[in-house]
């Protein structure tokens, strides 16, 4: 009897995502700081399965076809799980949130839920498919989200306004900039004693069109200085409508002036470069920009919602959208960065995993005492 009573008193929350990488990459460092909850994971089986099992209290498999915009089988599978588990849920990404809302429809046992929208993504892109999907969802989106989600966490106020205008969401909203970084894990770049002979430029990103991959290729071909080397790190995102085509991937691989690295260990390898570019056309809060600023790279980024929030940082230049020649000019004129200690102090105070985890934990506690 005592054991059963104890089990009922355990506060449990399930981190839910349609991609195992999301629960591993930026959420793994949050778990150890959240002491008031038993954190479980639910996601598809993937290459990070073993790491996820070592981090979370328990792991449930959720098979989903990422190539489908709406996987009906995955929705039904999630619905069955929701019927049989007593847990709060924290959904990560808008796509996962939509699937959760559909699975939760008309269920009697309402599991309280938080949604972190870390990017408006495909749904709010300009493609004809996205416009059609928005048109189809518009009549139902308000009911779906207000019925299933208690709290939505955004990463900047601009995108929050866009989403609320579309969804008419009236429950609680919070703005928590960034997903947090575990700053102690990063190798810091040493300040050079002299101007380096070779200057290394890198773009780290999923290989998506809206991440500016093709713009980056244009820059590579426009810069003519022999002492500048260009690198691209990241992988394709199968199932994402913005995933670059096989043909364009071949162009990337065949570009003689570009070194394609695939996946890298950002925490230990980012310090090997001098300049970090962020060329996304939209971004809620650029994690790679935050990481680059912490490590000590000079950063050049498009001026969008997810980068402008970091305008007070040193060694950061923001450029208006589509001004590729200004990127070229800035790269060619780059000399050396100034002291980076201010950036590290700001990040350690406001943007670490520990800081974000404490904000999450506060939200979870408020859910527990709400009706």
Predicted feature locations:
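Membrane-proximal helix-turn-helix segments that form the acceptor-binding/catalytic region
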Residues: 32-34, 76-79, 132-152, 248
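A conserved mid-protein helix/loop that constitutes part of the nucleotide-sugar donor-binding site
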Residues: 23-29, 203, 208-222
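Donor nucleotide-sugar binding/catalytic pocket of nucleotide-sugar-dependent glycosyltransferases
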Residues: 142, 146-188
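Aromatic "clamp/platform" in nucleotide-sugar-dependent glycosyltransferases that forms part
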Residues: 281
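Acidic anion/phosphate-binding donor-loop and adjacent secondary structure
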Residues: 67-70, 164, 174-198, 209, ...
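Short hydrophobic beta-strand element within catalytic cores of glycosyltransferases
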Residues: 298-301
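Glycosyltransferase donor-sugar binding loop
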Residues: 42-48, 181, 204, 229-244
């Amino acid at each position: 009897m005592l054991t059963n009573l104890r089990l009922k008193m355990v506060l449990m929350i399930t981190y839910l995502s349609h991609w195992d990488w999301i629960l591993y990459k930026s959420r793994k460092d949050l778990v150890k700081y959240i002491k008031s909850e038993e954190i479980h994971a639910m996601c598809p089986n993937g290459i990070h399965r073993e790491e996820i099992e070592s981090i979370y209290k328990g792991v449930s498999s959720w098979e989903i076809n990422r190539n489908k915009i709406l996987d009906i089988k995955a929705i039904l599978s999630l619905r069955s799980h929701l019927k049989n588990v007593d847990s709060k849920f924290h959904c990560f990404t808008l796509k996962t949130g939509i699937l959760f809302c559909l699975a939760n429809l008309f269920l009697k046992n309402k599991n309280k839920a938080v949604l972190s929208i870390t990017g408006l993504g495909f749904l709010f892109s300009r493609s004809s498919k996205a416009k059609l999907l928005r048109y189809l969802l518009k009549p139902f989106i308000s009911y779906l989200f207000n019925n299933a989600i208690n709290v939505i966490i955004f990463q900047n106020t601009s995108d929050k306004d866009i989403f609320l205008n579309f969804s008419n969401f009236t429950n609680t909203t919070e703005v928590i900039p960034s997903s947090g970084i575990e700053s102690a894990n990063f190798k810091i770049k040493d300040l050079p004693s002299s101007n380096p002979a070779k200057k290394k430029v890198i773009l780290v990103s999923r290989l998506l069109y809206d991440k500016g991959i093709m713009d980056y290729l244009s820059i590579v071909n426009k810069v003519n200085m022999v002492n500048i080397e260009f690198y691209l790190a990241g992988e394709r995102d199968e199932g994402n409508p913005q995933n670059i085509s096989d043909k364009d991937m071949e162009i990337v691989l065949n570009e003689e002036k570009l070194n394609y690295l695939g996946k890298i260990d950002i925490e230990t390898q980012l310090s090997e470069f001098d300049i970090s570019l962020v060329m996304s056309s939209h971004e809620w809060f650029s994690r790679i920009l935050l990481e680059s600023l912490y490590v000590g790279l000079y950063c050049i980024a498009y001026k969008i919602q997810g980068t402008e929030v970091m305008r007070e940082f040193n060694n950061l230049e923001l450029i208006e959208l589509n001004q590729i020649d200004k990127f070229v000019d800035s790269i060619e004129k780059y000399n050396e960065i100034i002291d980076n200690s201010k950036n590290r102090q700001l990040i350690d105070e406001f943007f670490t995993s520990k800081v974000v985890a404490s904000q999450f934990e506060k939200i979870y506690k408020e859910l527990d005492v709400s009706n």
